[in-house]
């Protein structure tokens, strides 16, 4: 709605409010409307009055209130309703609801306020500035609006220029010099087509957004200048603008420069003042062209000779060209020369002073004014990087840390080219910009200034070129070369493009190949630099990641070890450590067990370690026999038992150490006892010969007594499975199948009782000696002892003897076992001879497998038995290393061993239970029947009911003889033993 329309409703609203306050109830037409009682402040304006409806409504100006749309209209109901109900309904529906009168009034008020603000700030309000200033469109983000702004500005410029004469232009320039802050100056600048706004961003946006418009404007200006024949006027006007620049620091100097440059460029391009070479030079030197173009080509050459003239003229347009370069992308020569001149001005006040003096020669007043103006605006440019700066500007005045340097483009490795002024600075990335700019300036100023000539001595082309038109051509060539060298920079690339387009590329083409080479070299160097800098960035990223993620400060080089550390402790490394000690499992096991136990009953300790639950009950004598000569055999036995039975393995955790230790000391004693028992039983000597080194004395005795069933099949198979592992495997299997074997062996051992009798005596002695050690090592060696005794116990079925031997857990006596075999040998052999042969074959296979697995795992864990026992054995039987890790799991697993041994015993008892029951019951309870043929040690220990071999062996034999009662007895006995072990 228009402001007038808004004003009308406001005035009318007041009247309506008064009317409403007086008349709470009013009629719209004939219908009565009941309105709630309200105060004037609360009531919204109601313009709906009978008067308004009487007169015809002008819908162009009619308002909602006039039509009767009021807050009450939304709540209207029948007249019968009360005001309270109306109020409630109104509360529910209208207040705050879209379309409610309150909301509408608010929206209307806000819209009015905004309209007022826009009217005040709108570009239309600023009519004087609207004509030629694109600043009016600063709020406009559309390119079309900016283009139109530029067009309008250029049109105004054309009109002013056509109307103004050169004298008027000069007068305008003087007035600008006197006071540039005045609106006239601003309008003139705006007319020139450049925004009055001094911010580099706005200038850049305006210039970049409408390059075509700007070009068209410059062309129009050039046309006007040519038509008016006031090229000199324009040239003068441009310096006038330049002189005005020092006065107006606030005014956008680059804009003025751009205007002057644009005029000069258009003049030079359109006017045939000079040949193409000089024209190109002038095109490159927009300031010079106005200066020289106004007079003649000779004037241009003089301008080039006296760099002060181009410096001054170009100093202002050089900055202009900077903006124009980014916008119009003028030929590279213009950029290079103007850049050089501007670089001279930027390089320092002394440089500017010299050019100012030279300019004084040409135009003292104008140039003097221009030089300070150039200094100030250039400083501005140095400060403000918003504009697109030419590479020359960067080379001249900007520090090395300019944005271009960040990309690495300004950096130019100084390569082979020493002829071109830029080549030598190219070697030094940061020095190049300064040298290049100075050289370019020197090219322009060389002849007049000796210091510049000295600086440009490195640039032979510039120094060699004599001052004059030739200098202009040489300067143009040098500028072309410079542009080619400046490629890394964006402006330099633009230059090159412009140079190629202009066609002034004679020297450029000649030097194009070396430039390409240099560019390639530079690129390679830049790549190298970037590659060298990349690792630093990566390092920064590393540190940043560390800080960000909050992870521990670990270098990437540590990632591999870190991964290993982060990984959960693999089970493989645990067995690996025991594997390292595979060579020394005996020593480790002996260390695990007490030295006394090892010395006395090393082998018995092994047997006890495995036989802790069951073997201790019955296989005390067998334990002495079970420990084998070879410590590896004891380890294998322990490992076999552990693999066969998890509880036994836990027991074997202790056992393997003790068993290996016992194997060292008692292995020899057992070997002797085995040899004795082997000597006594000729049929068993076969088994003993194999078993003495490999199997424990129990097997030897059993073999001697049961040479055929156990000796040949079982013990030999055990030999095949592993000599060292035979006894443990037999014991493990004996816990299950060796019970049957022992029962059968007891049958076979019955005839061999006489043979085992002698070893019984020797074994009994050993068991007596070893009993103490076995008692000490009951905790450590129960597993290994349980292995050997397990087999022996299978042979010896008397549960009573198993219990007695329990107390003498490790007092394994081959003699006692042999006595067991002798005493129980006949019944055991009679009962379990046949079954034992069958079981021995099965057990041999099982024993072989178990022996292989147990040997590996047990040898691995032998070194670190204590540390890894518990977890490992619980999870994997093969990975016994974990079980060996900690001795505590061995104790925990002892009850398991008891249970398993008892179960195995019960299993073994099931087959030979009747046989061994008769044997064990017939014979003394301590000495289990020599049922376990391979466990002749158990037989020997059976002679000595105290001895520990009867633990597993006796339990097995008890199971064999009396399957259920011995099992029950064995389980409690195993429990008691386990209690004793800890």
From Swiss-Prot:
Residues 518-545 have a biased composition (Basic residues). It comes from the Eukaryota. GO terms for cellular component: chromosome; cytosol; nucleoplasm. Residues 931-942 have a biased composition (Low complexity). Keywords: Cell cycle, Cell division, Isopeptide bond, Mitosis, Nucleus, Phosphoprotein, Ubl conjugation. The modification Phosphoserine is found at residues 100, 122, 133, 286, 296, 306, 390, 397, 424, 572, 595, 735, 913, 950, 973. Residues 75-87, 207-216, 275-315, 451-473, 498-512, 651-668, 952-964 have a biased composition (Polar residues). The modification Phosphothreonine is found at residues 309, 402. Phosphorylated by CDK1. May regulate its subcellular location. One of its GO terms (biological process) is cell division. GO terms for molecular function: protein phosphatase regulator activity. Residues 669-685 have a biased composition (Basic and acidic residues). It is found in: Nucleus. Residues 379-436 form the PP1-binding domain. Residues 75-97, 192-216, 274-315, 400-473, 489-545, 568-638, 651-716, 910-982 are annotated as: Disordered. It holds the Pfam family PP1_bind. There is a cross-link at residue 741 (Glycyl lysine isopeptide (Lys-Gly) (interchain with G-Cter in SUMO2)). Regulator of chromosome structure during mitosis required for condensin-depleted chromosomes to retain their compact architecture through anaphase. Acts by mediating the recruitment of phopsphatase PP1-gamma subunit (PPP1CC) to chromatin at anaphase and into the following interphase. At anaphase onset, its association with chromatin targets a pool of PPP1CC to dephosphorylate substrates. Interacts with PPP1CC. This is Cell division cycle-associated protein 2. It comes from Mus musculus.
